[in-house]
């Protein structure tokens, strides 16, 4: 049996971590993104760990047809997630394929996505399994809270030490 084929749509933080985990488990992983600089960065940093490709509509469905799992990890700040796979396109996917919609908090990136819970996380549409749990980090609340604290503490300390104006002027992450 060959490795699972995983397509990750979105090469941001969430998509990159999903790709790393899947590749680490032996999957054949392709990350799709619309940012050429981001794709170059992923190739430079993770070269060989997983493949990257530009996320055109045609390329997305072409790769999705062969995938065992498709992870939707797209984010457009301040906007609803784009619908990347339509209900009609489900029939083109492998029977039993799994859609994981990490963008469900922004409305979902698959037309057939609907928010689920940790207690009842999966459902099936036309032979395709869906996992669309909102607030996925809630499954490991203590760990995710500690991680969030560790990630945000340097910013809080800078704000406390410098005041908001100077901290924002000094740090491009706070400025954004």
Q: Language-model segments: what does each one mean?
A:
Residues 104, 108-176:
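Adenosine-phosphate binding glycine-rich loop
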């Amino acid at each position: 049996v060959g490795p699972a084929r995983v397509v990750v749509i979105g090469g941001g933080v969430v998509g990159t971590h999903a790709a790393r985990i899947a590749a680490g488990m032996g999957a054949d992983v392709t990350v799709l993104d619309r940012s050429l600089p981001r794709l170059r960065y992923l190739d430079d940093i993770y070269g060989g760990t997983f493949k990257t490709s530009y996320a055109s509509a045609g390329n997305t469905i072409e790769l999705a047809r062969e995938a065992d799992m498709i992870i939707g990890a797209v984010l457009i700040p301040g906007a609803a997630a784009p619908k990347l796979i339509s209900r009609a396109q489900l029939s083109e996917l492998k029977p039993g394929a799994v859609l994981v919609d990490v963008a469900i908090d922004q409305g979902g990136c698959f037309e057939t996505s609907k928010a689920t819970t940790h207690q009842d996380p999966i459902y099936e549409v036309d032979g395709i399994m869906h996992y669309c749990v909102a607030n996925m980090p809630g499954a490991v609340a203590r760990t995710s809270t500690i991680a969030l604290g560790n990630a945000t503490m340097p910013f809080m300390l800078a704000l406390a030490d410098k005041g908001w104006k100077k901290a924002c002027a000094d740090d491009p992450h706070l400025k954004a």
